Amino acid sequence: MEAIRQFDTCNIANAIEKFGIRLRNEGYTRPGLQCVTGGFPRLLGYAATARIRSSDPPMTGSSYLDRTDWWVGIQSLPAPRIAVIQDLHAESGLGSVVGEVHAAVLKALQCQGMITNGTVRDIPAVARMQFPMFARAAAVSHGYTHIVDYGQPVRIFGLEIRPGDLLFADCHGVVSIPHQIAAQLPDVAARIRVQEQRIIDLCQSPEFSTEGLLDAIRTTDQGN
């Protein structure tokens, strides 16, 4: 599985298309998600899902640190893990989903990072932990953030994610990787990258010609 990490999400999305197992406009997030902790990290792991509310107070308790049962749910999934948290009031993003304390908890639970459609905070401190956070934006306060449930399907920027889904995230967004083809993807992605590099090299060469470009494209099409 780690061989996937040498590629980016664009390479992997192209490779998935070759198997024809889903529509080309499915299986990835829509625009708006960003890595707020900076850099260009690549997250690869199994989704540990939860749903929270940040705008309204919970019926009992005060925050989602009051709910420790979801930690057991996280640990029931294979590692490496990615915490995937849907804010049911994400349009306002009133309360931060994760900050420094909970990032430390999630990292201790072998989560490689987290993904949310909501907001996060304590960004410099979490960045120093090397715990990537992919979110809509930053927020000052956690507001009334509390867990509604966990271990259920969530929806993040148009992508439906189920517990245990294999996810790959980078600066472009998140792509969901079908388990049945995961082992084959690195080889397919590598072939595509070689084919694309031929075209790029030709375009940057003093020997460039449109005839040569058409030949390179035909060769690429024949190899697909």
Regions flagged by a language model, labelled:
Residues L167:
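C-terminal binding/interaction regions
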Residues D170:
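Beta-strand-loop-alpha-helix segment that lines the small-molecule cofactor/substrate pocket
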